[in-house]
Amino acid sequence: MSYREVSRVLIMAGGTGGHVVPALSLARALRARGVSVEWLGSPRGIENRLVPAADIVLHRIQVAGLRGNGMAGWLLAPWRLAKAVWQARQVIAKFDPQLVVGLGGFASGPGGLAAWLMRRRLIVHEQNAVAGMTNRYLSRLADGVYAAFPGAFGAHRAEVVGNPVRDDIAALGETPRGSDALRQRPLRLLVLGGSLGAQALNTQVPQALARLPAAQRPDVRHQAGRDKETATQSVYAEAGVEAEVSAFIDDMAAAYDWADLIVCRAGALTIAELAAAAKPSILVPFPHAVDDHQTLNARQLVDAGAARLMPQTQLTAESLAETLATLLEPETLATMATSARAQARLDAVERLVAGCMEANRDSQ
């Protein structure tokens, strides 16, 4: 069977960039092989901005998560699920995909159930080190189960393929930055708080840097998040530390390329990008992540010696300053960079595409 014999694939992913960005990488790879791709999402997730921008048809169904919705949410859940499944069945009937691929998010649950009820081939991919509720359920119905991390589905068998990473980011790590290059200029620290920002990083990083001797301080670029740029600039000014602060970073590949050490959260996509780009890191997992999955994500790089783990409960100016002082050495950073690249799974997209073709081949 050739790739062109699979002509239509429906991708289900939504909510956050951690689901949508890897799914977009898969969509681009499928389209490059002549496959028609459409998307199933919800009305409020980031897919509403990113998917149309990629010139992909986006179908929206009315669906929301169950966790945190209280007793009323659970009582209404069966009716809401039935409605969402009915909407998803309409999308599938109209687009008539040969394969449905779920990568997490609210729409994947009813969409995957609709695909199973309509006897369409279904595969799922889990980006985090522990599978979310939707993917755990769908893994029991799916024809193929893929994971970025070993053990994501517990005892359920899954093929570990990693997370898709953009080509321009993966290319950065082809030659990890060595100690000789790092000695030629001031070291560079990149702080990433995500689109909403991370208040703990915005307050503690400037104060930690202030504790370092001026000669040891790196050049700093700090992405502070929406509506947090001015306040973060003030914290740096009060600490007497120079930094370039921005609300967002439009070109992540350029930002990674600039950096020698990165302080950030431990989302699944971030972990994959750090490894691919060969970037040492200090990882501060988001403490309220479901099932504490960011801490589990971080273990891949931490156990390999490519990152240091700093739980937010232990994040103080003193502890961070001590860690920075230890890591801001050319030899240390060079060793960590090599270790990070060794953890990269650069063929994740190709293996997912192959999985799509294999699932469809089995149906012939």
Curated annotation (Swiss-Prot):
Pathway: Cell wall biogenesis; peptidoglycan biosynthesis. It is a peripheral membrane protein. One of its GO terms (molecular function) is UDP-N-acetyl-D-glucosamine:N-acetylmuramoyl-L-alanyl-D-glutamyl-meso-2,6-diaminopimelyl-D-alanyl-D-alanine-diphosphoundecaprenol 4-beta-N-acetylglucosaminlytransferase activity. GO terms for cellular component: plasma membrane. InterPro entries: GlcNAc_MurG, Glyco_trans_28_C, GlycoTrans_28_N. Keywords: Cell cycle, Cell division, Cell inner membrane, Cell membrane, Cell shape, Cell wall biogenesis/degradation, Glycosyltransferase, Membrane, Peptidoglycan synthesis, Transferase. It holds the Pfam family Glyco_tran_28_C. It catalyses: di-trans,octa-cis-undecaprenyl diphospho-N-acetyl-alpha-D-muramoyl-L-alanyl-D-glutamyl-meso-2,6-diaminopimeloyl-D-alanyl-D-alanine + UDP-N-acetyl-alpha-D-glucosamine = di-trans,octa-cis-undecaprenyl diphospho-[N-acetyl-alpha-D-glucosaminyl-(1->4)]-N-acetyl-alpha-D-muramoyl-L-alanyl-D-glutamyl-meso-2,6-diaminopimeloyl-D-alanyl-D-alanine + UDP + H(+). It is an enzyme of class 2 (transferase). It is found in: Cell inner membrane. Its EC number is 2.4.1.227. GO terms for biological process: carbohydrate metabolic process; cell division; cell wall organization; lipid glycosylation; peptidoglycan biosynthetic process; regulation of cell shape. Its main location: membrane. PANTHER family: GLYCOSYLTRANSFERASE (PTHR21015:SF22), UDP-N-ACETYLGLUCOSAMINE--N-ACETYLMURAMYL-(PENTAPEPTIDE) PYROPHOSPHORYL-UNDECAPRENOL N-ACETYLGLUCOSAMINE TRANSFERASE 1 (PTHR21015). NCBIfam families: murG (TIGR01133). Cell wall formation. Catalyzes the transfer of a GlcNAc subunit on undecaprenyl-pyrophosphoryl-MurNAc-pentapeptide (lipid intermediate I) to form undecaprenyl-pyrophosphoryl-MurNAc-(pentapeptide)GlcNAc (lipid intermediate II). Belongs to the glycosyltransferase 28 family. MurG subfamily. HAMAP family: MurG. This is UDP-N-acetylglucosamine--N-acetylmuramyl-(pentapeptide) pyrophosphoryl-undecaprenol N-acetylglucosamine transferase. It comes from Chromohalobacter salexigens (strain ATCC BAA-138 / DSM 3043 / CIP 106854 / NCIMB 13768 / 1H11). The gene is murG.
